[in-house]
Amino acid sequence: MVFVMSAWSASGQDSLTLVFAGDIMQHESQMKAAFDPAKGSYDYRGVFEGVKPWIQSADIAIANLELTFGGKPYTGYPQFSAPDEFLAAIKDAGFDVLVTANNHSVDRGRSGLERTLRRLDSAGLLHTGTFADTLDFLNHYPLILEARGFRISLLNYTYGTNGIAVRRPNRVNPIDTAQIRKDLARARQQKTDAVVVVFHWGDEYQQLPNRAQQEVAGFCLSQGAKLIIGSHPHVLQPMYWNRDQDNLVVYSLGNFISGQRARYRNGGALLHVTLRKDHTAEGTPRTTLADVSYSLSWVNRLPDSRRSFRLVPVGDPVDSLAVTGSNSRALYKEFINDSRVFLDRENRNVGERARRKRD
């Protein structure tokens, strides 16, 4: 099935911008901060306000939804079920697509998985990775996104579901190279301009990818994938743009929004990708990676009565002023320094957008 994100102008638009975010989570501390006892409801206004311009500037914005909208009772770790008001905030932030295959997909069993899919549909958010049944999978996978004259295939897989069985007829895509091979072949048959694969993989809190991640990434590249994006470690991992082979592997974007406050886990990165389509003399278009960069964002807790959560875009001097208090300022600076030192050392051809603009 094809979903049109935006129209293509007759002027011959030949570039497409994508933004990828890491893990969207909802811990108990986040729910407590958002709860309004006077209204008996949850208020997430402002959580994403600082990074909205980054998200909304993209033609397509994609994130990893690492929770369910399984209904009450609302719970955080270890089995997540977030208030529906949080979904409204995600939509308002500007996200277009959520990938849903991860180790928390069936935290609320079959009913939670299916309710999550219904809520995403009601909100007008596209999704892939989990399915109500086999027919749903066959009709909607790979997910094809159309924008500005581009057709993009999106695939999504997880290493597991925390030992919770996926109840029939539900489906959660596992990392199975035999099945992935078939899915990538199907994507090629759909004649899309680029194939994007998002994996939930790796070791939690480890900054370097393990051998399994590297092997699966290499396998997918050999089968025609152009972009591979990872989640699950909850910390940043390296980003490799192979200009010669024209492909990109980002092993982990870290936490986008969560209640985790430990070092390396209290923020993450947004990935900015520009695809360019060139029309050859024979009329056969060729799509390449024209530009790749990242932006850091940090999760701040405000000094208000609720200790509200706010995303702070690193590099924006106005938003950084919102980080007040000596302890918060110290944590903010620590995250920036840790992230820059690590990514400057490990990344290949992927730099920070804010610093590149200053240069």
Put a short name on every predicted segment.
Residues 12-359:
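Acidic, metal/ion-coordinating pockets
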Residues 1-7:
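Bacterial N-terminal signal peptides
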